[in-house]
Amino acid sequence: MAKFIFITGGVVSGLGKGITAASLGRLIKSRGYRVTALKFDPYLNVDPGTMSPIQHGEVFVTEDGGECDLDVGHYERFMDVNMGKGNNVTTGKIYSSVIAKERRGDYLGGTVQVIPHITNEIKSHIRRVAEDSDADVILVEIGGTVGDIEGQPFLEAIRQFKNEVPSKDDVLFIHVTLVPYIAASGELKTKPTQHSVRELRSIGIQPDVIVCRSDREIPKDLREKIALFCDVPPEAVIPNEDLGSLYEVPLAMEKEGLAEIVCRRLGLDSRTPDLAEWEALVQRAKHPEREVEIALVGKYVALEDAYLSVVESLNHAGIHNNARVRIHWVDSEKLENGITPEALEACLGRADGILVPGGFGYRGIEGKINAIRYAREKGIPFFGICMGMQSAVIEAARNLLGLSKANSTEFVTDCKDPVIDMMAQQKQVTDLGGTMRLGAFPCRLKPGSKAHAAYGTEVVHERHRHRFEVNNAYLERLEAVGLKAVGVWPEGNLVEVVEMEGHPWFVGVQFHPEFKSRPNRPHPLFRDFIKAALEYRAGKK
């Protein structure tokens, strides 16, 4: 029988429940157990695919094409386990399933209600993930904060779930809460935690472990106070103070004994964790030998979480290259409207590498094109992802081929030279949600290319999220001016990778390599991009 760990949050949102779940998953896996994770999001959207990145952060794409919450990315990176569509479920998805069953007559004319029908659907999904994953331990994160109206069905479902498992030792509840510091009085306050736990207990859930987030060390006497008022053992009050890196969190939690408490409470054999690789990783991250600066040119830079996996992939590559990656955030809109060469130089001149990530819509696109031209002409390492690659194609068409009206039909439907066009199979699609080219597809790389050298193999599988592609009608002319197609989808001759001939490192990819990077196994393209940026930096001195 699998074991289930339910993780809830209190006081405020954004405390790091996902990092807590991911870190604990890593610690349990390091003891030789199979783990997986499931995130419940209480919003009514069926998935985050159509949500604004500025509101929600990035959409993480799984191998099977699931458009998921960014916490699923944390799960994959920390646990080094591929997740799928089923590992992120929203209220919208639960209600859609229940309503579809009602329309089919599955409820035999019964009155469909939140209890038991919605809660049963939630519990059914938890069991399905357990069966499909064959994991020993399933970590289930409940999004939002205890007390939110939207989250009530999920909390009720997990309360019921505990009463339905064969043994009470099969379920454990962890509550992540805030212990704020009040500067005026110079004190850490436990009252918000007490009230949050009281709210949780009022619906029938008694936490077994309380993880206390704070910006500083929590003294022993305050931990004992929380234990007393919240009815948990003192050792089950786990401090989780701010650290220099996310990757330090598993080691900090191991030091506090979280995994041992969890294993003991769930009746799992105590095993010695194998964290040597993770410890070495953290040490390299804390003591880099050099620095490199990357200009990240995007339209969603107001919220850094919109590019979370890109940032983490840069960090992974930096760790591998013994370098601290400093990101210079550049709003692509500020590079538009006839920006002068001097202003462009002032904005991008200090960069050792320029990265243009994915995105949608025309806003900011001209600024991205200006940044790409700057990288191409100055010989600065460039990495374009999804729209970043498409922007590189438009830049080459305009400034090397002389097609001044070159554009994407995403922005100008009747443009004179549509060097980027909608994929044929997308032209009849009307709904936006879940209809893009999603998930992992093969790509065949050309030997001798930088991409082939990075991967060390001819066929790779990468994750996608797009509707538009390079228009092959322009490919021969683009290649004639130096923009080479060095990677294609074998089944449809779709251009997946382009490189600029004669440039030190200029690579654009249609896929999203950031979704497959791991702290201990950086993505080959990010690894080589940072290496090229370091070489460029060394050459400037």
Swiss-Prot record:
Reactions listed under catalytic activity: UTP + L-glutamine + ATP + H2O = CTP + L-glutamate + ADP + phosphate + 2 H(+); L-glutamine + H2O = L-glutamate + NH4(+); UTP + NH4(+) + ATP = CTP + ADP + phosphate + 2 H(+)
Binding residue positions for L-glutamine: G359, M387, G388, M389, Q390, E410, R467
Listed pathway(s): Pyrimidine metabolism; CTP biosynthesis via de novo pathway; CTP from UDP: step 2/2
Domain Glutamine amidotransferase type-1: 293-539
Binding site for Mg(2+): D71, E141
Gene Ontology biological process terms, A to Z: 'de novo' CTP biosynthetic process; pyrimidine nucleobase biosynthetic process
Notes on activation and inhibition: Allosterically activated by GTP, when glutamine is the substrate; GTP has no effect on the reaction when ammonia is the substrate. The allosteric effector GTP functions by stabilizing the protein conformation that binds the tetrahedral intermediate(s) formed during glutamine hydrolysis. Inhibited by the product CTP, via allosteric rather than competitive inhibition.
GO cellular component, one term: cytosol
Residues reported in the UniProt entry to bind UTP: S13, K189, T190, K191, P192, T193, Q194, K225
Signal peptide residues on this chain, from the entry's feature table: none
Keyword Ligase (UniProt): yes
Region (Amidoligase domain): 1-268
Function as written in the Swiss-Prot or TrEMBL entry: Catalyzes the ATP-dependent amination of UTP to CTP with either L-glutamine or ammonia as the source of nitrogen. Regulates intracellular CTP levels through interactions with the four ribonucleotide triphosphates.
Note: CTPSs have evolved a hybrid strategy for distinguishing between UTP and CTP. The overlapping regions of the product feedback inhibitory and substrate sites recognize a common feature in both compounds, the triphosphate moiety. To differentiate isosteric substrate and product pyrimidine rings, an additional pocket far from the expected kinase/ligase catalytic site, specifically recognizes the cytosine and ribose portions of the product inhibitor.
This protein's name: CTP synthase
